[in-house]
Amino acid sequence: MNILFIADPMANFKTYKDTTYAMMREAYTRGHTLFHTLATQLTVVSGSVQTTVTPFTFIGAQNDHDHAWFTVQTPFQAALNTFDAVIMRTDPPFDMQYLYATQLLTLAEQQGAHVFNSGQAMRDFNEKLAILNFPQFIAPTIVTTYAQQVKEFLSEYQDIIIKPLDGMGGMGIFRLTQSDPNINSILEILMRMDTRTIMAQQYIPDIIKGDKRILVIDGEVVPFALARIPQNGETRGNLAAGGRGVAQKLTTRDKEIADTLAPELKKRGILLAGLDVIGDYLTEVNVTSPTGFQEITKQQNFDVAALFINAVERHANFQAAA
């Protein structure tokens, strides 16, 4: 197959843990031909969604993370529907530029491209708001533009988490308690004087045991979660915020949440999702660029990238040579 990855610059990948790298490596090992482009390079020419693609191949040892790992060939312009699969792996934030990219991906799908995850699915599933579709699994939550409502929510629950709807990697997340002397200042900064919508949730003490990432691939739940355990004094378990990743078996509650969401995600055209769970509560549904493949594979000997590429091959109607 010819597979196009829409991703951030490959030279910036941390190959020892990067999930997109793991996907690429697995696809390359199977003999697929790989191409890379940036989301900002998507264009429409004569009605056709196109981009500047760069063919690349792997070089060096698989476990050599200290030297160059790829070599590129001459870039060229190509329509997205000329590839067997297009894998969208651009990191958030989900800003207007990201929105435009998903709209172009939807147009490309209408022209016959196989895009994972679909542009429509990424638009429909805001990674924070998506949990509201599953109220049976979430902690007390409000979404509001008004600081006064957050203060009332804080008064009721005494200890809360507030976060923007378009963040990633734990950026912009604050823990507030009723005794915090900086409540007004924090809300003014985060909510921009009642002009920015945020989410507030009751604080979940189980965060000290880890913010668990549960992966769902084409409706199949990976049997291990990556618990991202915060540093001492932190309330954010995100790896980007310094959290430590520990792969562990799913609990009964984890399975209940994941098994409920999995068929709905598949129905919505979401090939890969990352469910974030703290304790017994679902906190996010990540559909833009979920991570955790390498940590789970290394710690539990469960090949997540193979499961993912299997799913891509199925949806692209690929049949390996006998």
Each predicted region: which residue ranges?
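Short glycine-rich anion-binding loops that position phosphate/pyrophosphate groups of nucleotides
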Residues: P9, D91-P93, L165-G167, P290
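Short acidic-hydrophobic, aromatic-tinged amphipathic segments that line or gate anion-handling sites
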Residues: T141-T145
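Phosphate-binding site of ATP-dependent enzymes
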Residues: T19-T20, A147-Q148, S155-D159, G169-K255, ...
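Extreme N-terminal starter segment of soluble prokaryotic enzymes
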Residues: M1-L4
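Conserved N-proximal alpha/beta basic substrate-recognition cap immediately N-terminal to
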Residues: A11-F13, K17-T29, F35-P140
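ATP-dependent carboxylate activation and anion-phosphoryl transfer catalytic cores
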Residues: I6-A7, F13-Y16, K249-A322
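Short glycine-enriched loops at secondary-structure junctions
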Residues: G119-R123, R228-P230, I278-Y281
